[in-house]
Amino acid sequence: MFKFFSSFGDSNEKEIRALEPLVDKINQLENSFTTLSDEALKAKTIEFRARLKNTFETTTAGIQEDITSTTAELAEAQKIADNSKQSRLKAKLESLNKDLSAKENTALNGILPEAFAAVREASRRTIGLRHYDVQLIGGIVLHHGKIAEMRTGEGKTLVATLPLYLNSLLGKGVHLVTVNDYLARRDAYWMGPVYHALGVSVSSIYPMQTPTEELPSRLFDPDYTSEIPGDPWTHFRPISRQEAYKADITYGTSTEFGFDYLRDNLRPDLAQCVQRDMNYAIVDEIDNLLIDEARTPLIISAPDTEAGKLYDVFARLSPRLVVVKDYEINEKDRNAELTEDGWANVEKLLSREGVMKGNSLYDPQNAPLIRHLRNALSAKEFYKKDHQYVVKEGEIIIIDEFTGRMMLGRRYSEGLHQAIEAKEHVKVQQESKTYATVTIQNLFRMYRKLCGMTGTAATEAEEFSKIYKLEVVIIPTNKPAVREDYGDQIYKDQSAKFKAVVNEIDEMRKLGRPVLVGTVSIENSEMLSNMLKRQGIEHKVLNAKQHEKEAQVVAEAGKPGAVTVATNMAGRGVDILLGGKEPTKDDAKVYNEWQAHHQQVLEAGGLHVIGTERHESRRIDNQLRGRSGRQGDPGSSRFYVALDDDIMRRFGSERIQGIMEWAGMDENTPIENGLVSRTLENAQKRVEGYHFDVRKHLVEYDDVVNKHREVIYAERRKILSGADLKSNILDMIREEIITQTAEHTRGYDSSEWNLDGLVTHLNGIFTLPAEINAEALAKLSQEEITDLLTRTAEELYQKKEDETGAGSMRLLERIIMLHTLDSLWVEHLTIMENLRREIGLQAFAQRDPLIAYKNEGHVRFQELLETIKHDVVHNIYRVGIQIQHQTESATAKAASRPVQQQKPLPAAPAAAIPGVSAKAATQSTTPAAKEIGRNDPCPCGSGKKYKKCCGK
């Protein structure tokens, strides 16, 4: 059965052949599992877990202990900024984790044949699907932590059940990451009976619609029946978020997994956290998420009260600036720079508006104006209505450049979204303050084992390898592919190209073939739709404006003569079946009619795919082609290209224009030859390489803040887990006393010491006894002063604890540490955002901006750690025990606010998958209390107003 593997490259072929013996073992076990009763099959899971437990107890106990002790050492080294020790401990920790993973995988490999055989049998019994041998290969590749490239229609959903079940046996939880919420629900529910037959629980996490929603998730439970009439998810029992993550297998989107991670790191109590450690994840359509979506940060934010009228000012100003005369644009990098005349013109216009301070835009106090100007010019030149966004019900909604879907709840960051709102004269929303953020790249690099599935990964193999250390393995199809991919046809302009597209659509539908037409924008899909209407050609349009219906539309796109115009990859994840969606066999007449349609389309040649423009990524083109020819069905594809297409205009059109003129061809005559195709492919490779470099560079920038986040979140976990904070705080107090004593007692002669200043400073922390004053200290040596003050501080600390009670003091320590850490971390994120925005100017000083950013970021982080110590020391003696009635920090409150997924200002075109507005849920552990006014005294006893303290 492996005879057709010879068509694959040597390395891929060897990889596949090496798995043959394992597939044979699974097949040999099939008969023995077929004879098992349902109870005996389910009992296999208990047996597998017991065997794994016995193996782990004998092989991993020592490693687990070493990991725990090394993690504690690393946390201490990070606090004292011992870089050498940190590097050594990180290397040791990485080695230990690799050893642990290796032993776990060895144990899992030992039961893999039996586990896969059990899943295959459970699937056959419950949903009537038996895994093909090539699907077993795909499952093995995923278990090994690699990317399985599988063609459209090869059953990726079913393949995932194999490694998900196997890895769930460890009891650490496994995640299946889908591209949208519908697929997370559909796949978990569809495969639910398979897992249930094996005694394994499966859940699906839903987007939380309100901050108080208690059951935003579902668990597959055959014993539960929904009371909602016609509910398609009748056996999905509502459960809490925590229960969903306690399930053996959890399905969800990247945004939900990511926001839950961020929300957990904002919560005031570990009992409210929902996620377990990130163990094993399978990412469906992994190229979409880790390549197209890689640069998109997940951000939990709250409105910032600054800025407002400036957006309107610059929206009025930018149309009065003339390209070339006032500014120059760089389409490749998507930026605009003022000319010398432009600077003068802008200064004159801003002075007239009364917003510029001083006489020059270069004045430092006018720095915010530069950001507004850049955003206004970007909004004008690079962000076009119905291309990058649509205006719907008074809101700017981003359009995914790859799928054409509307990304509800998503906003451009750094003020760009507000600039577009001002340009389109809709209400300008407030800017936001970031409370927590993580990029998709860094989120998924946290998993101990990561793998993925897609139909198109080979073209991005280098990026997967270098950034994620993931190997791509091409899985053979179950049946040979017979789709015919015709050569590209090149026309002089858009008009001639779309006329040819309409003609080909008409020809194909008259043959009884269904036609799928891919466009790159909503504007193009609607223009083509109008052309088809004028020709009297019936069709359906699938774009971001109708994405609610996309699953139904795509499912029917395979009917004889059906014409579907889709914005790029809208409907991804839903198969196009020849003849239309296959009905059940309950109605014989309907089923026979479908069979007749199915046979008619097969005989006509299958689905024909037309691409109306080459994408910047070959992978996206391949995804469109891949909708045709599924599971050995016949099909064909062709791309139409015009010289004024975006990619042709930016890369390579001059050469092809010369060829057409040399050949003396008119606008209605296309070119179709190998040279043109190679030129196009080379242009795509250059763009892909450029985007790869951008993403790789951004990873290096993101890693700076990522390291900071790891330290802060680890410290936060220690605080919430009940660590010995008293010792930590007393150490901080001792450090402060040592530092201040050294600062105020410089010089050999005690007459030069500033002891009055030392006493004044320490009285700002705690009240010194009357007998400890400057005169008394003048009689002591520097060492004696330090000892006396340290002893006094410890006595005062103990006195406070005796007065308040040990329990209340521990609570006080936790809340002060948490509040200080959270509030200063938010400020640090803002500082780092501003630093990153401005660091590019370092290039003018012949300095590498990345190195400058790393160095400056390190300085800022050390300042953050010192400020945390300073604020804790200066508050711990002054704050009263009333704080026990108000336990949430400002950042913890942000966990109950709406969150947004934002896109960064792109240095190059970036793609994104559909996002949804997400809202966090906070389960309060404190008793209900009277609402506190913003100007009331803070209940923590600090003496400050609530809005200036815990109400920040």
UniProtKB/Swiss-Prot annotation:
One of its GO terms (molecular function) is ATP binding. Its cofactor is Zn(2+). It catalyses: ATP + H2O + cellular proteinSide 1 = ADP + phosphate + cellular proteinSide 2. One of its GO terms (cellular component) is plasma membrane. The keyword Translocase applies. Part of the Sec protein translocase complex. Interacts with the SecYEG preprotein conducting channel. Has a central role in coupling the hydrolysis of ATP to the transfer of proteins into and across the cell membrane, serving as an ATP-driven molecular motor driving the stepwise translocation of polypeptide chains across the membrane. It is a peripheral membrane protein. Its main location: membrane. It comes from Dehalococcoides mccartyi (strain CBDB1). HAMAP family: SecA. This is Protein translocase subunit SecA. Residues 907-946 are annotated as: Disordered. Belongs to the SecA family. Residues 907-921 have a biased composition (Low complexity). Keywords: ATP-binding, Cell membrane, Cytoplasm, Membrane, Metal-binding, Nucleotide-binding, Protein transport, Translocase, Translocation, Transport, Zinc. GO terms for biological process: intracellular protein transmembrane transport; protein import; protein targeting; protein transport by the Sec complex.
